[in-house]
Design a protein with these regions (language model features):
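Hydrophobic structural segments
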Residues: 1-133
Length: 133
């Protein structure tokens, strides 16, 4: 993907340490303050590299696979994409569309407030649009 000044939709990188997919999922839950995530792949698989893409990450599945990462962390991964990636050896953690984008609100509020100090910039509270039971 085209990147401008280091900015763009997805990122790849190394996890803080080698960990199992299960540990990685717990780490994602902690970092994103989420009650749950969906996992495609073997929970005991060791992962060291990750691709992260906010929102719907289906379009980033192939680039993440081609980059050789162990796990794609994204939201809104559909059933077949998740299964296909796991079958190819790349695990997927679906943190949900909301889960991967909610943190952007305050970040963007701060950026806009700094760029346009004459404006009053507020972030709107958001929550998942559905309820897990």
């Amino acid at each position: 993907e085209e990147v401008l000044n280091g900015e763009g939709i997805g990122r790849t990188g190394r996890l803080p340490r080698a960990m199992t997919l299960d540990e990685c999922a717990q780490y994602v839950k902690t970092c994103f303050s989420l009650p749950n995530v969906r996992i495609f792949g073997e929970l005991n698989k060791m992962v060291t590299t990750a691709a992260v893409s906010p929102g719907s990450g289906k379009s980033m599945a192939r680039p993440a696979f081609e980059a050789g990462v162990d796990v794609l962390i994204s939201g809104d991964i559909d059933h077949h994409t998740g299964i296909d990636m796991a079958d190819c050896g790349m695990a997927v953690i679906d943190a949900g569309h909301y889960g991967t984008e909610a943190m952007f609100i305050d970040f963007m509020r701060q950026v806009l407030a700094k760029e346009y100090p004459q404006l009053s910039v507020e972030g709107m509270p958001v929550k998942e649009p559905f309820t897990w039971i």
